[in-house]
Amino acid sequence: MTTLPRRIGMLGGTFDPVHIGHLRGALEVAELLELDELRLTPSARPPHRDMPSVTAQDRLAMVRSAVAGVSPLTVDDRELKRDKPSYTLDTLESMRAELAPRDQLFLLLGWDAFCGLPTWHRWEELLEHCHIVVLQRPDADSESPDAMRNLLAARAVSDPKALKGPGGQITFVWQTPLSVSATQIRQLLASGKSVRFLVPDAVLAYIDVHGLYRAPNTDGSP
């Protein structure tokens, strides 16, 4: 009896904190592509972004609480175990080594991240290990950078369900528009405002219990 290839997705990020935009986008792609598993992968030392505001342990705990019981979303902490920058290529190579040759691996990227790929570490090798699924928002600039046009001409597939083989192709998926960002959430929390309904209840409870993202107390009161 032939075993069907597994279909595994990866969504990386600082998740500082994880919010409904991350989660809704991940779930929509998982359902559309009928993924067996979609791994949210917190980065330890992102090469192209500022260092996270809270510890890796806190970010990991929030992501775990956010996806608990929500199949097929899972958490992969391998980048937090490395004592070096979190290069996506290293993570994909590590994941690919654990899969069967016919298994499909999908890297989820936002539009801005996709347009910035030419600045990534050994970015030309990414498609050797995975398909790339670009999460597209209706309000995003749809003009791709010059460096990506030849790649898109050769590798783009219009139907996300038509991706063939273990990797090597690029497709686009339209997201439900949710205007929420981790920066916005941190700013709201620092100003003492509520972020209810912007993050899952379990994440909000963790933030409250651990006092994360609050403005430092400067008046000397307890």
Swiss-Prot record:
GO terms for molecular function: ATP binding; nicotinate-nucleotide adenylyltransferase activity. It comes from the Bacteria. Keywords: ATP-binding, NAD, Nucleotide-binding, Nucleotidyltransferase, Pyridine nucleotide biosynthesis, Transferase. The keyword Nucleus does not apply. Signal peptide: none annotated. One of its GO terms (biological process) is NAD biosynthetic process. InterPro entries: Cyt_trans-like, NadD/NMNAT, Rossmann-like_a/b/a_fold. Its EC number is 2.7.7.18. Catalyzes the reversible adenylation of nicotinate mononucleotide (NaMN) to nicotinic acid adenine dinucleotide (NaAD). This is Probable nicotinate-nucleotide adenylyltransferase. It comes from Pseudomonas syringae pv. tomato (strain ATCC BAA-871 / DC3000). The gene is nadD.
